Amino acid sequence: MRPPPRLEYSLTGVRKSLGGKGPLRSPPNSMMKLKDLFKDSLRNLGLYMPPAPLWVRPLSARSCFCRAVVQNGLLNRRQMVHAALRYRLGRSKNDAVIYWQIDQMGRVHDGKLMWYGADCHRLKDRHATWVTYLMKQYFKLPQGSFQSNHVFFGLHLVREPCTVCIVEAEKSAVILSELYPQYVWLAAGGLFELQPQKFWALQHYQIILLPDTDEELRAYTQWYAVAQQVMQSFLWPKQNRIYVSDFLERHASADQKRRKIDLVDYIQEST
């Protein structure tokens, strides 16, 4: 059996049958890749190939935050990579970490971009921003055109019966998840980001709140009030109490309270 003709000979025949002269040559850098050919074949068959989820595209453990965590000895590299994959951390083009807010159904609600210095603390001169805000700017949409419904950072990890610990900063949730893996660690994203409506996805779980500390007990008082408001709702299961930990209030020094440290800071300074 004779071998099939080479592709260029076949194209030459097609060229001649169309009245052209000489061999048919592809323009430079236009050779179709195998994966593109596969996509075209599926498209011709009427099959739909959904794009990768938004959080998958910039998934990275090399952002300024991840590097600072390893360099300061808060986690080793293996732990950092594991935590980055679990929390689906991203990285922007200008080296910010992206904290994706993903619910238990896998839906992305928003992404928070933050910058950290070499000491693993936030850069005060660079304010956090949101992916939805940047998208509105890019597509020239009015800022009031739509509002994202924020959820707890790390909510996608709450699936099986577990004890859920909620801290203020996303950074703390990521680090503590490797130090105390027996709990599922979520983050509110700020002192006043602990809002009652965010708790409805957690009404069947045991919840422990761990606010930051300060001299005036403002964080503890604020979070305690929110916990009481949630538990007093007639829709909240009465057997599921929300505990507000006063660990930092009892153990932090006066100087630490003045600096408004969180649990990660306390652990780092105690070792």
Language-model regions: role of each:
Residues 2-109, 157-161, 271:
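TOPRIM metal-binding catalytic domain and adjacent DNA-binding surface shared by DnaG-type primases
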Residues 4, 17, 72, 126, ...:
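Compositionally biased, intrinsically disordered low-complexity segments
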Residues 4-6, 24, 28-29, 51-54, ...:
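Generic low-complexity segments that are intrinsically disordered, proline-rich and/or Lys/Arg-biased
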Residues 7, 15, 20, 28, ...:
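Generic cytosolic/nucleocytoplasmic N-terminal low-complexity/intrinsically disordered segments
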Residues 9-10, 30, 41, 126, ...:
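Short linear motifs in intrinsically disordered/low-complexity regions
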Residues 20, 92, 98-203:
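Phosphate-handling DNA/RNA-contact segment within nucleic-acid enzymes
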Residues 50, 153-154, 262:
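Helix N-terminus capping/helix-initiation residues
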Residues 104, 161-164, 170-271:
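TOPRIM fold recognition
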